[in-house]
Amino acid sequence: MGQKILRDGGHLEPSVQQWDWLGHGIYFWEGNPGRAMAWAVQRQKEGKIEAPFVLGAIIDLRHCLDLFDHDGLAQVKQAHRLLMQVSVAAGTKVPRNVGATADRAGRGLDCAVMNTLHQYRKERQELAYDSVRGPFLEGEEIYPGAGFRSENHIQLSVRNAECVKGYFRPLHSKAASF
């Protein structure tokens, strides 16, 4: 897919999976081609892709919901309250985040909250977010008792494809060792 985009143009397709923790959009790792390649290699081992490939992108985040920002997190918290109220009123079950690892990779609740936030803004005719940016804490502790994990990264969900200015094949780097 990546080579086809570089050769023929076009865009990656937005993901609309129920576990898309930043809501639906085109997902990227921010500035971390090594982590992207490690993920692609793992997908190959699982038989989900044939050849690992990393596609870089030049992205203008534009109007971004930044989950490193206090106000951004407050909006997400409010969207969760709204989702809970709507679910109770409608008698529907709220999705849950599930998974055997600390990152709980099946992020159904987070996806529902983010999509609720975007729908609420749309209904109120507020400016739509073009992108969402947040920390993804993943993997094992890098040493006993560490707050750092082996696969931490910043993830982007681009909701507006016009934010993607172009694609490129990044130069890959390996983790430093000493």
Model-derived features: where do they sit?
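Extracellular structured ligand-interaction cores
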Residues: 23-26, 52-58
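A general structural signal for short secondary-structure junctions and capping/turn motifs
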Residues: 17-20, 46-48, 144-148
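Extended catalytic/binding region for NAD+/ADP-ribose chemistry, centered on the ART fold
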Residues: 17-43
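Short, solvent-exposed secondary-structure capping/transition elements
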Residues: 36-38, 49-51, 66-68
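Cytochrome P450 catalytic domain signature, combining two hallmark sequence patches
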Residues: 43-54
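Amphipathic alpha-helical interaction segments
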Residues: 29, 35-37, 47, 128, ...
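Active-site and NAD+-binding cores of ADP-ribose-processing enzymes
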Residues: 2-3, 7, 11, 54-178
